[in-house]
Amino acid sequence: MYQKSLLFSLLASSALAAQFPIPDSKGSVTFDEPYEIAAGETYDGGYKTYGRGVSCTGQSEGGQDDTVFIVQEGGTLKNAIIGSDQIEGVYCLGACTIENVWWEAVCEDALSLKGGSGPYNIIGGGAQGADDKVIQHNSGGQVNIDGFTVYDFGKLYRSCGNCDEQYARTVTIKNVVANSGKTLVGINSNLGDTASIDSSTCATDVKKICVEYKGNDTGAEPEEISEGPSDACQYSEPLSSC
């Protein structure tokens, strides 16, 4: 009887540990159009849930008009929950800070970096349920991801593999908690991309940690070159389990 009780307790603890730690919502807001955060301004969402009142269209490509928030150069979005009733999540059109922002269910992408040259700072927060990418990096420059939590995902970060204009992009990842994913990071090493993953990051049931692709500007599907630690994918394996 004691052994059965102990087993039940361990299973219950494991289940609780695997729950996505999204904060409790303080209310809900539905926008008729994207909410624009002006250059240099900060929007504090007060941990309310924000959406667009629409159904996710899966991996069908949306656009800027489908976003919940648009952040202009130097803007900050913080303390917000992005609901499941949206298509494109958040766009940064220049350097931005995304702090303690949570996605309850990713649709096409959670966060798209579309303009400027950074830096783009993602601090805290988290996302779950991404069939493909969580953070899509189309512009150039530096991305810093610190303290983000990601569950049930395709890729946490992907440097655009086939954009019309390509750049050498850099991403640093630390204090990230990753659970049940296909790839943590995807970069285009032939274009000069680099990824640095600190040992403070943990990964449980993540198939690939860092994948190098042959990026292009033709729109073709990029070819996977290699995976694992290298000059471009800078980390020590294995990462610890979460």
From Swiss-Prot:
It is found in: Secreted. Residues 1-17 form the signal peptide. One of its GO terms (biological process) is cell wall organization. Its EC number is 4.2.2.2. It catalyses: Eliminative cleavage of (1->4)-alpha-D-galacturonan to give oligosaccharides with 4-deoxy-alpha-D-galact-4-enuronosyl groups at their non-reducing ends. GO terms for molecular function: pectate lyase activity. Its cofactor is Ca(2+). It is an enzyme of class 4 (lyase). Glycans are attached at N216. Its main location: secreted. Keywords: Calcium, Carbohydrate metabolism, Cell wall biogenesis/degradation, Glycoprotein, Lyase, Polysaccharide degradation, Secreted, Signal. Residues 217-242 are annotated as: Disordered. Pfam families: Pectate_lyase. One of its GO terms (cellular component) is extracellular region. Binds 1 Ca(2+) ion per subunit. Belongs to the polysaccharide lyase 3 family. Pectinolytic enzyme consist of four classes of enzymes: pectin lyase, polygalacturonase, pectin methylesterase and rhamnogalacturonase. Among pectinolytic enzymes, pectin lyase is the most important in depolymerization of pectin, since it cleaves internal glycosidic bonds of highly methylated pectins. Favors pectate, the anion, over pectin, the methyl ester. This is Probable pectate lyase D. The gene is plyD.
